[in-house]
């Protein structure tokens, strides 16, 4: 008997076939750099910086920016942001810089230049007669890179969220050490004229490069990161959610995964912890792998590890966290089952703590405490093992262990308890639910059961 086949009749004729569904054909690509070469892009001919500044500023004022010119200018302007490397800086075996080296954002990557001239038109009809100062260059670089952050804000954010962010960014770049170079609301107007800056590969690369530099190097103009910070761990929401989750429930990654009672986690956990990556290395290229073009399809995104992502945010919803209630459910990754497991884990880690004395008046008191704790443990081990099932605690002692939680789920037939449903409905009904969010899912799924 073939375990993959089904047998049935059509017009009295026996049919045997293997049902096959469409599978995702895209290969997840890990960002590990194998050739020991720095990430690289190719741009047009390096411009005269004074001419380029005037052209790009006039284009910004007229909301007519040429993306190629913007990228060429941003790469050339890196020379203004020299800093000192605080420690030896290596990533994936590549020596980025040595301690004490003078470096700029351009030291982190390789930027090749062709002989193709840029346009450098003065579309705004404004001609700056003098040469721009370094603070003026820094302000223009900061405003241009902020177009990346604005283009990453989704339309789901309600009200004037994007406009408010743009206004706050403009205020930063008109305050010392920066100087005011554009009229108010210019940034938002420019963004509306071309809202897809984050999809332009070279612009994305440069935003990630600037961010990687300013995240490590102390610099007068470090506030430029306000526009680029979204390139850090971009398309990593699955891994970032998991990291936040284990901190929130105060477990190690290994301890937390023992609670993941579902076969669909296996592939995702293997994918998320692929050996040879620098997920835990500070200031690694890994942090900016998406913007630096090191991975086409991220293995760490919410879609790549959808069951893990769903579970974590159902636990977050149970704990009343707004971020989880607003997050978008990965509909193809068993949200109903994940909501059940999330209810049990939420119950275990919500409103309960694991506490013990850690500080003492003197060494004698510490030793007395440790001796008393040892006696307690010996007594517990000598217990006859009688189970006290009051209040649905099926194990006396370590009720929070993975074994105890798993047993409770099985004893309830893999279904949520009434108390879980009431909690889910309580947190989601008091929240203004966004479309396809966890709050909306819980409201629609469980409100009639409460």
From Swiss-Prot:
Keyword Phosphoprotein: yes
GO MF, one example: RNA binding
Keywords per UniProt: Capsid protein, Helical capsid protein, Host cytoplasm, Phosphoprotein, Ribonucleoprotein, RNA-binding, Superantigen, Viral nucleoprotein, Virion
Location relative to the cell: Virion; Host cytoplasm
Annotated positions of the Phosphoserine modification: 389
Example of a GO cellular component annotation carried by this entry: ribonucleoprotein complex
PTM field: Phosphorylated by host CK2. Unphosphorylated protein N seems to have a better affinity for leader viral promoter encapsidation. Phosphorylation of protein N in ribonucleocapsid may stabilize the interaction with protein P, thereby playing an important role in viral transcription/replication.
Gene3D superfamilies referenced in this protein's UniProt entry, alphabetically: Nucleoprotein, Rhabdovirus nucleocapsid protein like domain
Disulphide-bonded residues: none
Keyword Transcription attached: no
Domain of life: Viruses
Function: Encapsidates the genome in a ratio of one protein N per nine ribonucleotides, protecting it from nucleases. If expressed without protein P it binds non-specifically RNA and therefore can bind it's own mRNA. Interaction with protein P abolishes any non-specific RNA binding, and prevents phosphorylation. The soluble N-P complex encapsidates specifically the genomic RNA, with protein N protecting the genome like a pearl necklace. The encapsidated genomic RNA is termed the nucleocapsid (NC) and serves as template for viral transcription and replication.
Note from the entry: Displays a superantigen activity in human and mouse, activating mostly V-beta-8 subtypes of T-cell receptor.
Similarity comment: Belongs to the lyssavirus nucleocapsid protein family.
Subunit structure comment from the entry: Homomultimerizes to form the nucleocapsid. Binds to viral genomic RNA. In nucleocapsid, binds protein P and thereby positions the polymerase on the template. Protein P acts as a chaperone on free protein N to prevent it from aggregation before encapsidating genomic RNA.
Name assigned to this protein: Nucleoprotein
The species this protein was found in: Rabies virus (strain ERA)
Lineage of the organism: Viruses, Riboviria, Orthornavirae, Negarnaviricota, Haploviricotina
Gene encoding the protein: N
């Amino acid at each position: 008997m073939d375990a993959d086949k089904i047998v049935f009749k059509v017009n009295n004729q026996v049919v045997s076939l293997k049902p096959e569904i469409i599978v995702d054909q895209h290969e997840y690509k890990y960002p590990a750099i194998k050739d020991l070469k720095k990430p690289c892009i190719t741009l047009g001919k390096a411009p005269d910086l004074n001419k380029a500044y005037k052209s790009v500023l006039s284009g910004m004022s007229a909301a007519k920016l040429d993306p190629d010119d913007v990228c060429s200018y941003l790469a050339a302007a890196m020379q203004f942001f020299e800093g000192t490397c605080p420690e030896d800086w290596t990533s994936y075996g590549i020596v980025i810089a040595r301690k004490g080296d003078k470096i700029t954002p351009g030291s982190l990557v390789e930027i090749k230049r062709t002989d193709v001239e840029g346009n450098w038109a003065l579309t705004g009809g404004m001609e700056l007669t003098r040469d721009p100062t370094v603070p003026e260059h820094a302000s223009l670089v900061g405003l241009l890179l902020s177009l990346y952050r604005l283009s990453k804000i989704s339309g789901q954010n309600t009200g004037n969220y994007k406009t408010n962010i743009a206004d706050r960014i403009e205020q930063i770049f008109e305050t010392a050490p920066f100087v005011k170079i554009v009229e108010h609301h210019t940034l938002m107007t420019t963004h509306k004229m071309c809202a897809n800056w984050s999809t332009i590969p070279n612009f994305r690369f440069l935003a990630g490069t600037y961010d990687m530099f300013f995240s490590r190097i102390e610099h007068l103009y470090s506030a430029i990161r306000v526009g680029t910070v979204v390139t850090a761990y971009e398309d990593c929401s699955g891994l970032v959610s998991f990291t936040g989750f284990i901190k929130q429930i105060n477990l190690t990654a290994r301890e937390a995964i023992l609670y993941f009672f579902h076969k669909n986690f296996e592939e995702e956990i293997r994918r998320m912890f692929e050996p040879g990556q620098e997920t835990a290395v500070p200031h690694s290229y890994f942090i900016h792998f998406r913007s630096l073009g090191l991975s086409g399809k991220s293995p760490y995104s919410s879609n790549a590890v959808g069951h893990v992502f769903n579970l974590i945010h159902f636990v977050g919803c149970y704990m009343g966290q707004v971020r989880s209630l607003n997050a978008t459910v990965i509909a193809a990754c068993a949200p109903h089952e994940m909501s059940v497991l999330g209810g049990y884990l939420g119950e275990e880690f919500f409103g309960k703590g694991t506490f013990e004395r850690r500080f003492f008046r003197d060494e004698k008191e510490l030793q007395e405490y440790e001796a008393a704790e040892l006696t307690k443990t010996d007594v517990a081990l000598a217990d006859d093992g009688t189970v006290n099932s009051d209040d649905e605690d099926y194990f006396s002692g370590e009720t929070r262990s993975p074994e105890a939680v798993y047993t409770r789920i099985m004893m309830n037939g893999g279904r949520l308890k009434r108390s879980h449903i009431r909690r889910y409905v309580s947190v989601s009904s008091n929240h203004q639910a966004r479309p396809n969010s966890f709050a909306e899912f819980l409201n629609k799924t469980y409100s009639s059961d409460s």
